[in-house]
């Protein structure tokens, strides 16, 4: 019937490569992240609500630095946060459709660019049953975390493409800003922010309506209407 949602045409995005964030973009790790920050906030008398507003998509060291006026040792607190996340027993699952999408992509045309450390990133990707990337950029690899574009520029370079020819897939404001600062196209996941909060950026709730093919040297991402 004309005018219904099903009549909306599909959107196609053609790029050389895809740069995926991990937490909230490929895996749902919200329970583990919230559990760690709840304990850390209680430990230092920090308001949990305000902490959760600023932490998403950023490295542990940057969050520890943000509250360094409380007088603790930043390196020690960063190590505590990392260890708590590594050992948290909360389940880690894929964002719906993520595994199927990744398996449909040429392995040399996608990377994971995450604010997690390498040990945690590999652990979560495996726990969610996702294929491991050939290129993995983590908190260990960069001097400046998101929203600085360094990580996305590095991911694109390791794949062999300019960032301007890549698509960044992200759910967090810091990551979306970093992708844009790198000069990449961006596609947001509405797993953290609402569609209204993400507008006017293109966004999807998950990957169940997203397919990919490889044609004429380009990854063609097709988003159902």
Regions found by a protein language model. Give the residues of each.
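Asp-based, Mg2+/Mn2+-dependent phosphohydrolase catalytic module
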Residues: 2-16, 99, 109, 118-225
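N-terminal helical cap/lid subdomain that shapes the substrate entry/recognition surface
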Residues: 8, 12-106, 117-119, 130
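Hydrophobic residues in well-ordered beta-strands that form the structural core
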Residues: 28, 112-114, 188
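Residue-level marker of regulatory loop/turn positions in helix-turn-helix DNA-binding domains and
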Residues: 94, 113, 144
């Amino acid at each position: 019937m004309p005018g219904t949602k099903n009549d909306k045409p599909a959107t196609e995005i053609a790029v050389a490569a895809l740069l995926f964030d991990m937490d909230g973009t490929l895996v749902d790790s919200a329970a583990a992240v919230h559990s760690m920050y709840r304990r850390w906030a209680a430990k230092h008398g920090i308001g949990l609500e305000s902490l959760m507003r600023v932490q998403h998509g950023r490295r542990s060291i940057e969050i520890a630095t943000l509250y360094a006026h409380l007088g603790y040792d930043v390196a020690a607190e960063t190590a505590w946060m990392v260890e708590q996340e590594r050992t948290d027993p909360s389940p880690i699952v894929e964002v719906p459709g993520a595994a199927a999408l990744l398996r449909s992509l040429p392995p040399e045309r996608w990377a994971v660019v995450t604010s997690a450390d390498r040990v945690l990133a590999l652990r979560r990707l495996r726990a969610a049953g996702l294929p491991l990337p050939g290129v993995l950029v983590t908190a260990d690899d960069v001097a400046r975390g998101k929203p600085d574009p360094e990580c996305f520029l590095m991911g694109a370079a390791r794949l062999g493409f300019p960032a301007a020819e890549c698509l960044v897939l992200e759910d967090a404001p810091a990551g979306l800003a970093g992708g844009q600062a790198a000069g990449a196209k961006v596609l947001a996941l509405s797993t953290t922010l609402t569609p209204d909060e993400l507008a006017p950026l293109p966004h999807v709730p998950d990957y169940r309506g997203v397919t990919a093919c490889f044609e004429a040297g380009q990854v063609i991402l097709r988003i159902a209407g």
